[in-house]
Amino acid sequence: MKEIFVDPDGLIENVRSTLSHENVEYDTFVGSGLSAALILPRLATALDCAWAVVRKKSEGSHSCNEIEGTIGERWVFFDDLIETGETWHRVQKAVYDNLRHQRLRASYVGAVTYSWEVTYWSVGREPVDPEFKFEYDE
């Protein structure tokens, strides 16, 4: 994760190159927590797209919004890693609940992780623990 802080321009170029190489059509990055809040505005501006940050439940805020930012039509989940899938599930649920509430539609088009190297995970190929059950999966 240090790449965000040491070389954010390098991270941006790696994300751009990876998504271009994979022919991913996207218009939004969505992440969660402080690291997303720090990098997504810069990343999205550089790649000419929208961004949104989903608040973690434990984060106190003056805002009643679970999501800050804008979600377009084709969004990419952006996080340092996917281990159990808890954050991935939570972000997906928040995005779709928010869109449903606003009577909008958007498609999830994959995930980008950046902890060791920038990696694109196409839909259904995310390294999510199959044993992990999120509260809305039942």
Language-model-derived ranges and their functions:
Residues 1-23, 72:
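Active-site-facing substrate-recognition patch
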Residues 24-35, 111:
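Short glycine-rich phosphate-binding loop at a beta-alpha junction
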